[in-house]
Amino acid sequence: MRSKAATLRFQVESALAGRLPSPFEYHDRRIVETVSAGIPGIDDLTGGLPRGSLTEICGPPCSGRTSFLISTLASRTAASEVCALVDARDAFDPRSAQTAGVKLDQLVWVRCHNVDQALRATDLLIQGGGFGLIALDLCDAPPRLVRSVPLPVWFRFRRAVEYTPTILLVLDQESNAKSCASLVLRLRTEETWWSQTSDADAAAWPHSPGLLLDGWKSCAERIRSSAKQREPVAPAESRSESTGFEMQTIWNASSDSHTTPGRDVSEGARRKR
């Protein structure tokens, strides 16, 4: 019986040679490197984003997911890393991202029209390698479609990015990667700040409600964190299970709105209206 088991093991290892490293060998929890997400409060909460792992950011619309994405892209491109964004519903605004500090010449933007295209593009980018961050934006995709993505797909992504310097960042409305994600954060909006327009603006725009969005405060809750970190961005004693961060709107001359990268709410409170 033992000889048959040894023979079977040898056959399986031979068949998987070059595709899976030592499938029957025990692997201890690996120590991963973490990098800043560009938001001090998030770094304090998580210790940073783990490389070679899948990180999932979920939350309802207007909860700060896109702002989190822009902040992370700005942080990674500022560190001279090449990043990739897989945009499942072609919702990315490069002008807003550039205003917030993202270096577009270091960003590969893959514009998709459905979830299946986005998943295939993400798979190709991971296999190609060379990216410091690959972001899969499923925020605007119907939740029922994202929910129907088979769990083996997320497992494949996790295994493909493992032992690489790439951060795989998935953004959606619900947590779908389950145990395949090393870090899961749930975002929600807590407060918003508004300011009244000037008399000149009110005269120019008679049908305007007279209020402009100044910014908002989002809360991030840590749902899952399984990565063992080698050099966390923030010390463990300073971390809790949730944190808040603010996003501030920038209004330019053409009255287009953008958002700045997130900042910790401890930097100063804003007036709530």
Model-derived features with residue positions:
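Hydrophobic/aromatic ligand-binding patch that stacks against planar heteroaromatic rings
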Residues: 75, 96, 160
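Conserved inter-motif catalytic segment of the P-loop NTP-binding fold
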Residues: 60, 71, 79-145
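Detector for small/aliphatic-rich hydrophobic stretches
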Residues: 1-85, 266-273
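Charged, alpha-helix-enriched surfaces in structured cytosolic catalytic cores
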Residues: 34-37, 52, 64-71, 91-92, ...
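P-loop NTPase motor core
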Residues: 110-193
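C-terminal regions of RecA-like/P-loop NTPase motor modules
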Residues: 1-29, 191-273
